[in-house]
Amino acid sequence: MRALGAVVTLLLWGQLFAVELGNDAMDFEDDSCPKPPEIANGYVEHLVRYRCRQFYRLRAEGDGVYTLNDEKQWVNTVAGEKLPECEAVCGKPKHPVDQVQRIIGGSMDAKGSFPWQAKMISRHGLTTGATLISDQWLLTTAKNLFLNHSETASAKDITPTLTLYVGKNQLVEIEKVVLHPNHSVVDIGLIKLKQRVLVTERVMPICLPSKDYIAPGRVGYVSGWGRNANFRFTDRLKYVMLPVADQDKCVVHYENSTVPEKKNLTSPVGVQPILNEHTFCAGLTKYQEDTCYGDAGSAFAIHDMEEDTWYAAGILSFDKSCAVAEYGVYVRATDLKDWVQETMAKN
């Protein structure tokens, strides 16, 4: 049983008690807890119910209720002696962004609407983004991980050069990074933390989608600490609301680039993004707010209103548009989910 996030509710002699897991003192013979009166043809049963702290949910084969049997073992009618687990809730921010607002871009996140947003400082102090997808794993771009490293650098070489913050500048230690096996085409890497983070209203993973939310005109939110209008990194988390763009128009905009990022003076920003079947574009021509240097690795967050859940539909890969080019480029999350789940399970 994971101790993180778990609370046990005891029903003893007709009274309820909440006990933190890990508490060595569970005295069932406490004089302050009187035994209930006996009843004819009946008996008193000792029960415990496992519950989870806020921002966690119970994962169990049974209902989480355990009875003390004759062998003095706590058992569930379905799960037996197997204990439930408290797993982190994803995509349920306590203070979601106001989706009625009409000001596009440049808004400050004062409420903690993007608790999955992490800040990564790479080698030589460059700020980039990362996205919390569980209480121990984050997604970012492979290019972020390789910043100021040679193309031959290994994951072991990269790991100690990174500094990572979640929530309100909470420093977390990195155990390892895992690069996508085809990261020159699928610009993605995973970061595993040494310890699980405690999920709170300020620190919460975003869900990975099982269905494709990407369609032209669909609106998503991107947050980050990238450069602002003065080309300086901001110390306040900002966010922008952007629609998914027509992929064909995006390809034409970037001069029909279908190859890995390279210098091209005919491109609006002097370089070509990676554009392929694993990517999509988002952005507006009408407004002058956009993602910029340092925002890569952030999620294109979409709210599923039916489920009232936020999903990372994509991860920002090309963050050099900076309101000069019309579109940012994102890696499709649906193309990543199998690899992500397999990698997390193996590691």
Swiss-Prot record:
**Gene Ontology BP, a term:** immune system process
Entry annotated with the keyword Transcription:
no
**Residue span of region Interaction with CD163:** 259-264
UniProt family annotation: Belongs to the peptidase S1 family.
Task: List cellular component terms (GO).
Answer: extracellular space
User: What GO molecular function terms would the record report?
Assistant: antioxidant activity; hemoglobin binding
Domain of life according to the entry:
Eukaryota
**Which cysteine pairs make disulfide bonds?**
52-86, 90-207, 250-281, 292-322
Glycosylation, residue list: 148, 182, 256, 264
Q: Where in the cell is it found?
A: Secreted
**Record key words, sorted:** Acute phase, Antibiotic, Antimicrobial, Antioxidant, Disulfide bond, Glycoprotein, Hemoglobin-binding, Immunity, Secreted, Serine protease homolog, Signal, Sushi
Record flagged with keyword Transmembrane helix? no
The UniProt entry, under PANTHER family, shows: COMPLEMENT COMPONENT 1, S SUBCOMPONENT-RELATED, HAPTOGLOBIN-RELATED PROTEIN
Subunit relationships: Tetramer of two alpha and two beta chains; disulfide-linked. The hemoglobin/haptoglobin complex is composed of a haptoglobin dimer bound to two hemoglobin alpha-beta dimers. Interacts with CD163. Interacts with ERGIC3.
Gene that encodes the chain? Hp
Write down what this protein is called.
Answer: Haptoglobin
Chain's role: As a result of hemolysis, hemoglobin is found to accumulate in the kidney and is secreted in the urine. Haptoglobin captures, and combines with free plasma hemoglobin to allow hepatic recycling of heme iron and to prevent kidney damage. Haptoglobin also acts as an antioxidant, has antibacterial activity and plays a role in modulating many aspects of the acute phase response. Hemoglobin/haptoglobin complexes are rapidly cleared by the macrophage CD163 scavenger receptor expressed on the surface of liver Kupfer cells through an endocytic lysosomal degradation pathway.
The Peptidase S1 domain extends over: 103-345
Q: In which tissues is it expressed?
A: Expressed by the liver and secreted in plasma.
Which segment of the chain is annotated as a signal peptide?
A: 1-18
Can you give the residue ranges of the Sushi domain?
31-88
Its domain comment says: The beta chain mediates most of the interactions with both subunits of hemoglobin, while the alpha chain forms the homodimeric interface.
Primary localization: secreted
